[in-house]
């Protein structure tokens, strides 16, 4: 008989074991220790044991769901009227027994008790405070299509797709040539790549998630004035080495002032950043973009990133 309860302190090893046995795709870090879950999930200041619900067959954890309220608009605390179900796992031997349905129903009830009226199914930037760096690379981008069951489960339980993300990687060991045009040549002559700590003006929400990862902010600056034309955040993805067999970095936010758009500065930034990471023996850069963000998808593809998966977020009317 399957029983359901909230998180207990004895659960971390059982959850780590379930993660390893759940046949997750390339979007999930592999070979994770209990310490990884302790650091990225259970040690978060807003972790609520009632938001992590497990399904048990006697003493064995065979499934779990994790839900949380979204961050507020100021990115200073949780408590918005929105929330999300950011993780759902059921052991392959226990699927098609309505365990996932029961877990998501209980997660929805938890969010309702927290005052949440709008629920997303799938990790997004405003709802996922726990699994950044463990699932989805460096950015929350929904449940991965590659995992195979999410779309059918969502349709069967009344969820409708509300957002899709394109998941990209750039192979830094490949023989493909970077693009060349007059703007890029001019940019390279007058700019250089600078590196800095990205946490200088970070918000509480940024620090609780990305502050737990190795990170660097790259800026493309004018040599003469030191004025920054574009910048981006890069995060270490060493937890993916067992799964991917290569050292990887994740691309976060890309920033460019409006007055500098139209000059390919952001493309120059990504190309110079790729060269630097290659010199540091990084062989893969992982990135994602909402399908509605045409500018980012076009930029990534122009810089040599290739789509390898799709992330999906769902909602209920």
Provide a role label for each language-model segment.
Residues 85-95, 123-126, 252-262:
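A short, internal acetyl-CoA/4′-phosphopantetheine-binding micro-motif in the GNAT/acyltransferase core
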Residues 111-142, 277-289:
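Conserved GNAT acetyl-CoA-binding A-motif
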Residues 63, 163-164, 228-230, 309:
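A structural microfeature
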Residues 1-41, 48, 52-57, 61, ...:
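Short amphipathic alpha-helix that is part of the acyltransferase structural core
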Residues 61-87, 134-146, 151-152, 236-248:
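Conserved acyl-donor/pantetheine-binding loop and adjacent beta-alpha core of acyl/acetyltransferases
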Residues 42-57, 63, 208-219, 223-228, ...:
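A short helix-loop-beta-strand connector motif used in the catalytic cores of GNAT acetyltransferases and
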